[in-house]
C-alpha cells in the first residue's frame, strides 16, 4: 500500500486492529510516522470523550430518575452596548457532540459550526433577550435573570430540573446552581454556545446600523476602538447609559 493511501486510511476515527497490526510491521519511516500521529490523535480523542462524559455527571443523576434536564446560561453582562442574551437547552441522553464545551474555550468558527448541530439535536432550545433599556431600568443582574426566565419559558418542552451557571432563574422549577457551570455541564455549555452565537449575530446587525463602533468585532465590549468611537460620536440607542464610561458621556451628542 502506498504511503498516501495509508495516510488516507488513518484519517478514520476507528480502524480494524488487524490493519494497524500489519502497518506496525511496515518498516518505512513514513508509515511509522503516520502511525505515531494516528496514536496521538486517538489518545487525544479518548481524553476528549472522557472529559465530555464527565461533563454529564450532573445530568446523569437526574436522567436516572427519568427527568428532563435544562441547561441555562447567559452572555453579555459586561458589554457597554447591546442586550444580554440567555439560552436554555434540553439535551437528549444520547447527545454526542464531543466538541461542545464552555463557549469561551471555543473559537468563533467552532461555535458557529456547533450552533446548528445543537439546535438540530437538542430536545428543545429557548432564547431570552433583554435589551439595554431594560438593563438600565432594572440593573444587569435582574435583566440577566429575566432573560433566563424568558429562555426557559420559550422551551417547547418543559424540563423537570434546571442546571444554571451560578444564577437562580425566577421560574417554578427545581434548580441546581453551578459555579463555572459551563465548564462542568454539557447542558449549560450548549446553552452558552447558543446564547453567544445568537448575541454575536445581533451585534453584527447593529454593526451595520452603527458602523463607526465596530460592534461586529467588539460585541459591545469596551475595546480601544469602541471607546474612541464613544468619545467621538457619543452613545448610540443601544448603549447602556448606566454603565461607565457611557454614563459619563450621556451629555454628549447621541448617535442617530
From Swiss-Prot:
GO terms for cellular component: cytoplasm; ribonuclease H2 complex. One of its GO terms (biological process) is mismatch repair. A divalent metal cation binds at residues 73-74, 165. It catalyses: Endonucleolytic cleavage to 5'-phosphomonoester. SUPFAM superfamilies: Ribonuclease H-like. It is found in: Cytoplasm. Endonuclease that specifically degrades the RNA of RNA-DNA hybrids. This is Ribonuclease HII. It is an enzyme of class 3 (hydrolase). Residues 67-255 form the RNase H type-2 domain. One of its GO terms (molecular function) is RNA-DNA hybrid ribonuclease activity. HAMAP family: RNase_HII_B (MF_00052_B). Keywords: Cytoplasm, Endonuclease, Hydrolase, Manganese, Metal-binding, Nuclease. It comes from Lactobacillus delbrueckii subsp. bulgaricus (strain ATCC BAA-365 / Lb-18). NCBIfam families: PRK00015.1-1 (NF000594), PRK00015.1-3 (NF000595). Its EC number is 3.1.26.4. Its cofactor is Mn(2+); Mg(2+). Belongs to the RNase HII family. It comes from the Bacteria. Manganese or magnesium. Binds 1 divalent metal ion per monomer in the absence of substrate. May bind a second metal ion after substrate binding. It holds the Pfam family RNase_HII.
Amino acid at each position: 500500500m502506498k504511503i498516501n493511501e495509508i495516510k488516507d486510511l488513518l484519517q478514520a476515527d476507528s480502524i480494524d486492529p488487524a490493519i494497524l497490526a500489519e502497518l506496525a510491521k511496515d518498516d518505512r519511516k513514513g508509515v511509522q510516522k503516520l502511525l505515531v500521529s494516528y496514536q496521538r490523535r486517538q489518545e487525544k480523542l479518548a481524553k476528549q470523550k472522557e472529559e465530555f462524559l464527565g461533563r454529564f455527571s450532573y445530568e446523569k443523576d437526574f436522567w436516572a430518575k427519568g427527568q428532563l434536564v435544562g441547561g441555562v446560561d447567559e452572555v453579555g453582562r459586561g458589554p457597554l452596548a447591546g442586550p444580554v442574551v440567555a439560552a436554555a437547552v434540553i439535551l437528549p441522553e444520547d447527545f454526542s457532540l464531543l466538541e461542545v464545551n464552555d463557549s469561551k474555550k471555543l473559537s468563533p468558527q467552532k461555535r458557529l459550526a456547533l450552533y446548528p448541530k445543537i439546535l438540530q439535536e437538542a430536545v428543545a432550545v429557548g432564547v431570552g433577550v433583554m435589551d439595554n433599556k431594560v438593563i438600565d431600568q432594572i440593573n444587569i443582574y435582574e435583566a440577566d435573570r429575566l432573560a433566563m426566565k424568558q429562555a426557559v419559558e420559550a422551551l417547547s418542552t418543559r424540563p423537570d430540573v434546571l442546571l444554571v451557571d451560578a444564577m437562580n432563574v425566577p421560574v417554578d422549577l427545581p434548580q441546581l446552581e453551578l459555579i463555572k457551570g459551563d465548564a462542568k455541564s454539557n447542558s449549560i455549555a450548549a446553552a452558552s454556545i447558543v446564547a453567544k452565537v445568537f448575541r454575536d449575530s445581533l451585534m453584527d446587525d447593529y454593526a451595520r446600523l452603527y458602523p463607526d463602533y465596530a460592534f461586529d468585532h467588539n460585541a459591545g465590549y469596551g475595546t480601544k476602538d469602541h471607546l474612541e468611537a464613544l468619545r467621538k460620536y457619543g452613545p448610540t440607542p443601544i448603549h447602556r447609559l448606566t454603565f461607565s464610561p457611557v454614563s459619563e458621556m450621556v451629555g454628549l451628542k447621541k448617535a442617530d
